[in-house]
């Protein structure tokens, strides 16, 4: 077996939005001469489509729910406790298994939601780095909440003027979110003991917030974790995420349809892999977009919330409703005029990296803060105003926001700004760019001496 510069074990939290960015980082490490092993829970491993040609090794671990995964757990706290118990044992087994090989594990890169992985790394004498899948701004807000025992006072010094509606929802948790709130705060219990703190962002995008975070921990921004062939093109084999939890059948239909649409004419609507909208909100969206050409991704689990008979009324020549779409291919298609998004960090980074203006409709977690930055800091979109009491975005507000981005007074400026962020994303990943320098610094510290 070929001797590598080192061997990184990557341990993501078991959901698609966390698995994908760490896997992409593994590809960067592999391109620098590192062996990388990516762990997946048994349940996730059995439900995804893996690219067999990928250079990234896979190892399975247990979360205690091998047959049913997260949804079969009795509660969030129960799942997290069992994941810690079973996960730490099975990760330790993988480390031991490689100890006597030519490429023993030298570093663990673990999801920041799993601080127990750092304790494990220290037990084995390995280097370790938490991987934060949210922006520097959100991480800094969460850190402030942690050191202030879960509370925040507005305004927050050194950050843009924030209102309550701009904060991550877990910072102002309701009863149902308390377990997630605790998980967010626990990211910071031992992160100061890690060798590095990795953040899926890039220097120019999060410049000020990165500086704030660097005062409390050794931050390295290593994003965007978008496949290389869409940006810097240094890794020729990296043209997709190469694993997916969803059906891939509709990809060709989607891209063929887009190729026939005029440039900048289509509104792309997608709310990620987890967001659950109410029937009322779905009806408002359906009504708001009726005068536009659109591609709307409605997951199978959400389809029943569409207005009765809606799918039969869709003009197939002008619009398309699908259960899944190849998002990178869609966003990079010239037909797309704007991206109506829930503002999950991965989707936000894809929109920025591919230069697409956005209509922001945040739902929960870090999304409200991402929406704030989309509109007021990066100036690449408009946040749809929601009703204060119900939280519903009404059709008039949705339609107005789409028009603002597609053809409004500031439309040209938003498109130019989106192009600027795309150029800076490419620059950061290219040789000598900020992300490339940071990844080189990381590998120089963890390689076998």
Swiss-Prot record:
Enzyme Commission number(s): 2.4.1.237
Q: What Gene3D superfamilies does its record include?
A: Glycogen Phosphorylase B
- Role played: Possesses quercetin 7-O-glucosyltransferase and 4'-O-glucosyltransferase activities in vitro. Also active in vitro on benzoates and benzoate derivatives. Has low affinity for the tryptophan precursor anthranilate. Catalyzes the formation of anthranilate glucose ester. Is a minor source of this activity in the plant.
For the keyword Transferase, the answer is: yes
What taxonomic classification does the UniProt entry list for its organism? Eukaryota, Viridiplantae, Streptophyta, Embryophyta, Tracheophyta
As its record notes, the protein acts as a catalyst of: a 7-O-hydroxy-flavonol + UDP-alpha-D-glucose = a flavonol 7-O-beta-D-glucoside + UDP + H(+)
Gene Ontology molecular functions:
flavonol 7-O-beta-glucosyltransferase activity; UDP-glucosyltransferase activity
Keywords for the protein's UniProt record, in alphabetical order: Glycosyltransferase, Transferase
Q: What Pfam family is a match for this entry?
A: UDPGT
InterPro entries, sorted: UDP_glucos_trans (IPR002213), UDP_glycos_trans_CS (IPR035595)
Q: Return the similarity comment.
A: Belongs to the UDP-glycosyltransferase family.
Q: Which residues bind an anthocyanidin?
A: 18
| Active site residues per record | 18, 111
Instruction: Tell me which PANTHER family the record gives.
Output: FLAVONOL 7-O-BETA-GLUCOSYLTRANSFERASE UGT74F1, GLUCOSYL/GLUCURONOSYL TRANSFERASES
Query: Which top EC class applies here?
Result: transferase
Q: What is this protein called?
A: Flavonol 7-O-beta-glucosyltransferase UGT74F1
Q: Where does UDP-alpha-D-glucose bind?
A: 133, 327, 342, 345-347, 350, 366-367
CDD domains with a match to the protein in the record = GT1_Gtf-like
